[in-house]
Amino acid sequence: MTILTQSTTWQALAAHSHQIPHMRELFAGDPARFSNMSLSTCGLFLDYSKNRATPETLNLLQTLAQEAKLDAKIKAMFAGDIINTTEKRAVLHTALRSTAEQSIVAEGQDIVPEVQQTLNKMQQFVTSVTSGQWKGFTGKAITDIVSIGIGGSFLGPKIVSQALRPYWITGLNCHFVANVDGTSISEKLKLLDPETTLFIMSSKSFGTQETLTNTLTAKAWFLAKGGSQSDVAKHFVAVTSNVAKATDFGIDADNIFPMWDWVGGRYSLWSAIGLPIALLIGMDNFRSLLKGAHQMDTHFANAPLAENMPVIMGLFSLWYGNFFNAQSHVVLTYDHYLRGLPAYFQQLDMESNGKSVTLNGTHVDYSTGPVIWGGEGTNGQHAYHQLLHQGTALIPADFIMPLQSHNPIGEHHDQLASNCFGQTQALMQGRTLDEALAELSKSSLSDEEKLLIAKHKVMPGNKPSNTLLMDKLTPETLGALIALYEHRTFVQGAIWDINSFDQWGVELGKSLGNDVLARIGAEQDATALDASSNGLINLYRQGKI
């Protein structure tokens, strides 16, 4: 057993998990449960009353966090300590949304001035492009942006841009390319005019396979459509640490934005990786996005555990994963603009906490990161919600909804809200056999048929959920929401004693993929790998089954 599972508190939680009454009873016995188990901060309201929890549960979970030295680990992250131990790096995405007055030290120097300098450079660039001052090779202004990246340099900018569609004020169009499948970039290029298109290449090394391949394809298209090598600088910019490779490609050194080792890809949208966002919503709105995240950082760093929103959410996720065998967690966004958030949180959580050894290399004897999935309400109600209500797996849920719509048409938002709240009630309350029989009492079915149908209509309830509300979706509230989930992810990893900031599973896939690519291009049949891989490579080379 590990130190964590040997602890008295862990054992107490394991025993306590079998003693919690049904949530129906918890609500019936405590009229103040909603007010006692809800919290408001940073423009967000969290109702966590529909969880399998009593005051004793919360006390035990907070004790577990204290024993794991969560407070000290939070301070270590914000202080710039080397908490990404396998890569010997600080973890300071929080510095990207710091204020100019702060001082944050990494590797012996204050990094805030460089962060502010980069924001100012972004400001100048955005102004130049959106004002029409930036001209393409034929003297025309830019109309379309193509953001080329992968992972965090793709998903963050895409999802945030999508979420903030009501704040697109610059008149530009933005297209996102990530997949190395040639169809992806080909379909985008069909829509574009090389004279008015600007490409943003985002890769720390300027060598990420998918990103470089797509960028080279974009460059070939640009040159084939009338541009010259000397014109590349007018249509390509980069976010990278490898200035030499970017300039060799043809990008002007003045149009290269920095990336830092102390920012992981899945936490990078707050940096110059967010250029596509800023080009769509303007720098004032981009700074509001940063402001909302900074407010959540401040809350996370200073609020006591019992009143700390990321801590509460992280502890409940751990509670269900480790003591109720919950293998997945569903995120349900009741706002069309937020439909991409489940995919973003999926990457954030699963890439961070999909680990199986502790910081000292001991194999864990408890579950770590769950499968994160989800979708858009109310669509999911006509699909996978069936499994949530009557399936055999326990799947905790997060419901996210703004109280006010950007498009208040008729009763649309009232119906959306009623569905959201109704789903949380149904998951908690369920339907008993007696209630199902009562609903069938006036039917013409025989008593035997009524009993049979009633059994099929029973729902156990007691299915946990959180509800997150905001007044309205704005750059500021979105920033706070994303930072909330970042810190929630950190809380779990800190208690599990794993490194939430490396991704060696991703790295292995990259290296093996490169090896297979070399074998695909070889003259002789593949024979050096396992029989399955050899067979697949040879079939691919034949081009037919």
UniProtKB/Swiss-Prot annotation:
Pfam family, one: PGI
Gene3D superfamilies: 1.10.1390.10, Glucose-6-phosphate isomerase like protein, domain 1
Keyword Transport: no
Predominant location: cytoplasm
Pathway it works in: Carbohydrate biosynthesis; gluconeogenesis; Carbohydrate degradation; glycolysis; D-glyceraldehyde 3-phosphate and glycerone phosphate from D-glucose: step 2/4
Active-site residue numbers: E351 (proton donor), H382, K510
Subcellular location as annotated: Cytoplasm
Keyword Isomerase included in the entry's annotation: yes
Substrates-to-products reaction catalysed: alpha-D-glucose 6-phosphate = beta-D-fructose 6-phosphate
Keywords: Cytoplasm, Gluconeogenesis, Glycolysis, Isomerase
GO process terms (BP): gluconeogenesis; glucose 6-phosphate metabolic process; glycolytic process
Domain of life: Bacteria
UniProt GO MF annotations: carbohydrate derivative binding; glucose-6-phosphate isomerase activity; monosaccharide binding
Listed GO CC annotations: cytosol
HAMAP family found in the cross-reference section: G6P_isomerase
NCBIfam families given in the database record: PRK00179.1
Function: Catalyzes the reversible isomerization of glucose-6-phosphate to fructose-6-phosphate.
Protein family membership: Belongs to the GPI family.
Name of the protein described by the UniProt record: Glucose-6-phosphate isomerase
Taxonomic placement: Bacteria, Pseudomonadati, Pseudomonadota, Gammaproteobacteria, Alteromonadales
